[in-house]
Design a protein with these regions (language model features):
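Ser/Thr-rich low-complexity repeats and stalk/linker segments
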Residues: 1-66
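C-terminal beta-signal and adjacent terminal beta-strands/loops
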Residues: 552, 582-610, 622-623
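Outer-membrane beta-barrel "beta-signal"
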Residues: 575, 610-623
Length: 623
């Protein structure tokens, strides 16, 4: 039934596309109706009404009862993922969800951009692709996703570099030599992900995943005895490594509600970040993890146990050798905690690091740490943590608080008990806190942050009160753009580092990858201010300034046999740029520069008062 209005007594001619014509006459009030009898097929058709030389058009959508016919735009039927039918003649073909072409639209703002929604090829990640999880690879719900990544890093920096009698140049026979260093690192990553389930909303039923990484790294320094203990090996090193870094099987154990609440298990080498910012444990390693949610996803939880694999020294990738360190983690997430938009987390971490003796690939002793009394010792520590992430009104708030307690059989800096009362062990008791507050205003995000890790003021009092993490990788206070966070700074002549690469903690560890946690350390205080700027949709700039100081200095003085070291480490100024030329993650170019202005404490330790600089470029190509 078609209706409309026109001039009283006017004759109206109606035409429906591909269905013929009809006529009717308007009544005295100007209203007209027409019962359309010619057949109209399912589809969208144009209706044309003509009266007295005036023409009006309108679209008509027709949906007839019965099966939906296959759309001509997506013929022919793809041979992948077609359901097996025992009697095809008893069925009428219907369009499935993977072959319904979405409306065409452009990925970029350019008019000549390629439209989305077309059948793609094997090497086309933007349109439907069998190898990107867009179509079932077999059956009705088995999908395969291949990801290939090239991660290329070039870096140049100046760092305090120890020298000695075997120096490259006669002018370098002092405590510190030439400080220029260069690094090149290339990772080729191939990830294979086969999973059963749906591509959205519903949790995956089961999954097999493996990730291969081929690494090539080159480092060049200006002094001998650093890339290898043997000074005859020169000042540069080239190394390569291939690692099966990630391999696991995941299985959904049970659906808990109609709202996709579930419980699943994952077994194998798998990535896991135990909190929002990676303050305590952020690693890909061998373990078993049970995880899930309930109450319509308002609550999530993880129960995980890791028996960690040894890391390769120069690439940081996993090997197949167990390192005799076990980690157990339980955490609980509560969304909309007290206020909407804020997620609270509670966690318990336990680490047992066994007494072992281990040299890294470069021939350097890393367990136990070659400082003080370097005797193999066992560490057992428990971390209690509370953290949160979200927004309160217009303010973005991120915080974390941790307390660690436990026992270290023989801390190398504390040494044996001089009173011979309770053995040579030390009691661990230390804390850490972090807070960041930011405010989004249009394309600007100013932020303020504070980070604190307690230090040990009395290294030999049988209580270790310096905070250290299990395996941290924090994205905080400038993250990887910060000089202090990004670059490891060694303590000359001690075999330990003031701070490890990719860490904020002045933990005095021999190595973050291969060494043991070290709870007799100076701790650190960091006050940070920054500004994130979305310059364009393609370009983001990150400005950060950090003021850094020791919490306590006594443990550093004990190692260096040097008194009156000041607490001020220095000021870290950094700029980071992230550029996405295609407005997606397929090509990402990251660059940055940082300047470290030494404070009085840094000058006391390294005899350096001129600024240290760091620049890098990182190109990430993803398929």
């Amino acid at each position: 039934l078609l209706t409309g209005t026109s001039a009283p007594g006017a004759v109206i001619t109606i035409a429906i596309e591909k269905s013929g014509n009809g006529q009717t006459t308007a009544d005295a009030a100007g209203n007209w109706t027409l019962i359309w009898t010619p057949p109209v097929k399912t589809g969208t058709w144009t209706i044309t009404a003509t009266s007295g030389g005036v023409t009006a058009t309108q679209l008509l959508r027709v949906q007839l009862p019965g099966n939906v016919q296959r759309q001509p735009i997506i013929e022919p039927v793809l041979r992948y993922g077609t359901p097996e039918i025992s009697h095809p003649e008893a069925y009428q073909e219907m369009t499935d969800r993977w072959r319904i072409a979405p409306p065409p639209y452009e990925l970029t703002e350019k008019v000549q951009g390629r439209a989305i929604g077309k059948q793609g090829g094997t090497l086309d990640p933007y349109n439907q692709n069998l190898f990107k999880g867009d179509l079932p690879i077999f059956g009705k719900d088995w999908f395969f996703n291949f990801t290939g990544i090239s991660d290329t890093l070039a870096e140049s920096r100046t760092l305090p570099t120890p020298s000695g009698v075997s120096a490259v140049k006669p002018t370098s026979i002092t405590v510190f030599g030439k400080d220029n260093q260069n690094l090149f690192n290339e990772n080729l990553i191939a990830s294979f992900d086969l999973f059963q389930g749906l591509t959205a909303f519903k949790p995956i039923t089961q999954r097999f995943k493996a990730t291969l990484i081929a690494n090539l790294n080159y480092v060049h320094l200006r002094e001998n005895g650093l890339v290898k203990p043997d000074v005859r090996r020169g000042t540069s090193r080239t190394d390569a490594q291939v690692s099966l870094n990630e391999f696991f099987y995941e299985r959904k154990l049970k659906d808990l509600s109609p709202n996709y609440d579930f419980i699943s298990i994952r077994v194998g080498s798998q990535p896991f970040n135990s909190d929002f910012r990676g303050f305590l444990f952020n690693d890909t390693n061998l373990g078993v993890r049970v995880f899930g949610n309930f109450a319509s996803n308002r609550y999530q939880y993880n129960l995980a146990v890791f028996d960690r694999l040894e890391k390769d020294t120069n690439s940081g990738l996993n090997t197949f050798e167990l390192r005799d360190q076990q980690v157990a983690i339980a955490n609980f997430y509560w969304q909309d905690f007290l206020v909407h938009g804020y997620t609270q987390q509670f966690s318990v971490h336990y680490v047992r690091d066994e007494a072992t003796f281990h040299y890294d690939r470069n021939g350097i002793l890393v367990r136990p740490a070659p400082v003080g009394i370097f005797t193999p010792h066992e560490i057992r520590a428990t971390y209690l943590g509370e953290s949160g992430l979200g927004h309160i009104g217009r303010f973005n708030v991120d915080h974390a608080v941790y307390y660690v307690f436990g026992h270290d059989d023989l801390n190398p800096i504390a040494g044996p008990d001089p009173k011979l009362k309770d053995g040579d062990g030390v009691r661990i008791g230390a804390g850490s806190a972090a807070l960041e507050v930011s405010y989004d205003r249009d394309w600007l995000r100013p932020r303020l942050a504070f980070f604190y890790a307690s230090g040990d003021s009395t290294p030999r009092d049988r209580k270790a009160s310096g905070f250290d993490a299990i395996f941290d990788s924090p994205n905080f206070a400038g993250g990887g753009f910060s000089f202090f966070n990004r670059l490891g700074i060694r303590l000359a002549g001690t075999g330990v580092a003031l701070v490890e690469r990719g860490s904020l903690l002045t933990s005095l560890r021999s190595s973050k990858d291969e060494g043991q946690p070290q709870y007799v350390n100076p701790g650190v205080q960091i006050v940070s201010a920054g500004l994130d700027v979305d310059v364009t949709p393609r370009l983001k700039a990150i400005f950060t300034g950090n003021y850094i100081r020791f919490d306590k200095v006594q443990s550093v003085e004990a190692i260096l046999f040097q008194g009156n070291i000041h607490k001020q480490l220095g000021t870290d100024l950094s700029l980071g740029l992230r550029y996405r030329p295609l407005l997606n993650q397929n090509i990402v170019i990251v660059g940055g520069g940082a300047v470290f202005l030494p404070g009085r404490g840094f000058k006391d330790i390294y005899e350096k008062d001129r600024p240290l600089v760091h620049v890098f470029t990182n190109v990430i190509l993803t398929f």
